[in-house]
Amino acid sequence: TIMGYTQMRSGQVFWRGKDMSRLAPNRRALGGIGWVAQEREIFPSLTVEENLTVASRPGAWDLAAIYKMFARLAERRRNMGNQLSGGEQQMLAIARALMTNPALLLLDEPFEGLAPVIVEELIKVITLLLADRKIAIVLVEQHTEVALELTRDAVVLERGAVAHRAASAELMHDTATLERLVGLRVAATA
């Protein structure tokens, strides 16, 4: 809904003080919002490098910065999108969104269906993005523990409405609320 691919039933989407509710997705992207779809949506018949540059905009995120962050993509830059593993495709989808140099990055289920080693690699990337690039990230993720570890604030939605809002660290330690909201039992830590 924030990106404009799902119709809103009520409410408004504001970004940087501007009502984006009625803008097409491409206009929202031009306003500084990057989006990584759950389905990845890379271009299978383009090379990695072509995927990265097809919608790129000038800024800190250029090919050199992307290849430094995603060494696997540098190694595979001449491969076609459909020749990449699922994890590499997800890296490419995130990297392509970064090449638009967004101020806000929306990540929809970025860890879904990926091998644990790839999930760990992407967690490191997201952590670096949050620490070094001054980029805001909205993370939609069903792996609650991972999401809470990565984020500062947590918002639990139920049918599109806010069911609960708290600091992520606070919610991580509130096992009763977690179990009530998402059915998650967090192992006690010593």
Where are these regions (language model features)?
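Glycine-rich phosphate-binding loops of nucleotide-dependent enzymes
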Residues: 1-190
